[in-house]
């Protein structure tokens, strides 16, 4: 199974609504690693590493986000594979 890494930049109402916590929970539930980090512009940067099919499932959730969030747009780019062991929040 081919392992991939993707970097997402999520814009909308995604800070102070539990977005990073729920992002980490959903990523770990799918067996993905990476991180979620608040950005100064109000967006959240998310790196996920794992199988392409699991990343696609994660992206379906990310497009909606948790109940209190509002996702307006997501930029996505494939990045070089990173061997991470956990999912962190910054």
UniProtKB/Swiss-Prot annotation:
What this protein catalyses is: an acyl phosphate + H2O = a carboxylate + phosphate + H(+)
Any Pfam family = Acylphosphatase
Q: What is this protein called?
A: Acylphosphatase
Could you tell me the keywords of this UniProt record? Hydrolase
UniProt EC number: 3.6.1.7
S-S bonds: none
Gene Ontology MF term list:
acylphosphatase activity
Q: Which residues form the Acylphosphatase-like domain?
A: 5-90
What positions constitute the catalytic site? Answer: 20, 38
Q: Which organism is it from?
A: Aliivibrio fischeri (strain ATCC 700601 / ES114) (Vibrio fischeri)
Gene label: acyP
State the PROSITE patterns in the record: ACYLPHOSPHATASE_2 (PS00151), ACYLPHOSPHATASE_3 (PS51160)
Q: Does the keyword Hydrolase apply?
A: yes
The record's similarity note reads:
Belongs to the acylphosphatase family.
């Amino acid at each position: 199974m081919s392992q991939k890494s993707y970097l997402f930049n999520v814009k909308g109402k995604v800070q102070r609504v539990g977005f990073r916590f729920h992002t980490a929970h959903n990523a770990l539930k799918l067996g993905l690693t990476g991180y979620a980090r608040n950005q100064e512009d109000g967006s959240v940067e998310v790196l996920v590493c794992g199988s392409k099919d699991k990343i696609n499932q994660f992206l379906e959730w990310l497009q909606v986000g948790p109940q209190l969030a509002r996702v307006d747009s997501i930029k996505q780019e494939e990045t070089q594979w990173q061997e991470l062991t956990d999912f962190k929040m910054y």
